[in-house]
Amino acid sequence: MKIVQYDDVEWKRGLQHRGGTFHYRHLLNGTPGTLGNFQFNIGQLEGDFASPRHRHNFDQFRIQLEGTMNFDRNGKMAAGSVGYFPEGAPYGPQRSEGTSVTAVLQFGSASGSGYLSREEVYAGTEELKKFGTFEGGIFRRNDDVEGRRQTDGYQAIWEHMNGQRMEYPKPRYRDPIMLDPANYEWLPVDGMPGVSEKPLGSFTERQCGASIIKLARGSTYRAGERSVYLVLSGSGIAYDAPYL
């Protein structure tokens, strides 16, 4: 188990292949080069942030902590909402309505396409700048460079780093799924007195899912394997280490 204190992590500038201002705190990551690689960040976007309509070859969960994120025809995520953005399903264009803070978990999913590490994305971005420019989330090749004139920024990076054309997986869901946890009821967790849960959903044949857990004072929760937890309030002990 690894515990990261949010306040111990510095803000950094990121998403340079998209448009506008984005800073993040990088909390956790998996093992680069593996199909199950993942990345967990908390990002802050300003009102000038913009991202074109696009899709992923990985899965994504989003927790809107502050502000409102606008995904155009796919709807808005207000503070407190949770979103599941499945691989292959287009969404956006995306923009922030003022300052927005979001916890984002991205991970290799059912198609087996894996997930690029932040270091790989940065390296690919810098290498591609030798052949073109990133504008508004799109990579545009210079006129004297062979290849497609314009490509989604992340797709261009993925193809450059993998040396092959990206084949998007067929979407298991047509659209992102946005959830309002406030409308869920708390359920007791069997065998764990004082622990309640809001199971928000389980998705695809790989059964990736999201839940909200609440612990009464003095209660104990047994964490599952291959799970990532974000503590939003309170304090306690996790595997003999404190969290605040």
Residue map of PLM features:
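Jelly-roll (double-stranded beta-helix
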Residues: 1-63, 68-244
